[in-house]
Amino acid sequence: MKVHKGDMVLVISGPDKGAKGQVIAAFPKTEKVLVEGVNRIKKHVANSAPERGAESGGIVTQEAPIHVSNVMVIDSDGNPTRVGYRFDENGKKVRVSRRNGKDI
């Protein structure tokens, strides 16, 4: 998967189109990412189940995963770009911006 944890991404499709955020977690098996402040849902939590920082029960607002095809990585110039790969001089695989050719 070309989007990793810590990447800055732009949402290109869906209700949160145009929103920018940092990737909190990536789930390669399901091809989904968790983006900070994007795709927020309300979850009803029981009183006895402390989950994701909620000591008492009630309604908790949290991020839900979004499909990786609905986001684009933001490069060093601040523009959304597609991601490519190349091998550096040591033979290590690095991600490259398709827009400007710089390393991500």
Curated annotation (Swiss-Prot):
What are this entry's molecular-function GO terms?
A: rRNA binding; structural constituent of ribosome
Gene Ontology biological-process annotations: translation
Asked whether the UniProt record includes rRNA-binding among its keywords, one would answer yes
- In residue numbers, the region (Disordered) covers 82-104
Is the keyword NAD assigned to this protein? no
Q: Where is the composition biased (Basic residues)?
A: 93-104
Which InterPro entries does this chain map to? KOW, Rib_uL2_dom2, Ribosomal_uL24, Ribosomal_uL24_CS, Ribosomal_uL24_KOW, Translation_prot_SH3-like_sf
Q: Which Pfam families match?
A: KOW, ribosomal_L24
Q: Which domain of life is it from?
A: Bacteria
Give the record's keywords alphabetically. Ribonucleoprotein, Ribosomal protein, RNA-binding, rRNA-binding
Query: Which CDD domains is this protein grouped with?
Result: KOW_RPL26
- Record's GO cellular component terms: ribonucleoprotein complex; ribosome
Recorded hits in Gene3D superfamilies, A to Z, give: 2.30.30.30
What SUPFAM superfamilies does UniProt report for this protein, alphabetically? Answer: Translation proteins SH3-like domain
- Complex formation: Part of the 50S ribosomal subunit.
Q: Which family does it belong to?
A: Belongs to the universal ribosomal protein uL24 family.
Q: What does this protein do?
A: One of two assembly initiator proteins, it binds directly to the 5'-end of the 23S rRNA, where it nucleates assembly of the 50S subunit. One of the proteins that surrounds the polypeptide exit tunnel on the outside of the subunit.
Which PANTHER family does the protein's record reference? MITOCHONDRIAL RIBOSOMAL PROTEIN L24
The protein in question is named Large ribosomal subunit protein uL24
Its gene name is rplX
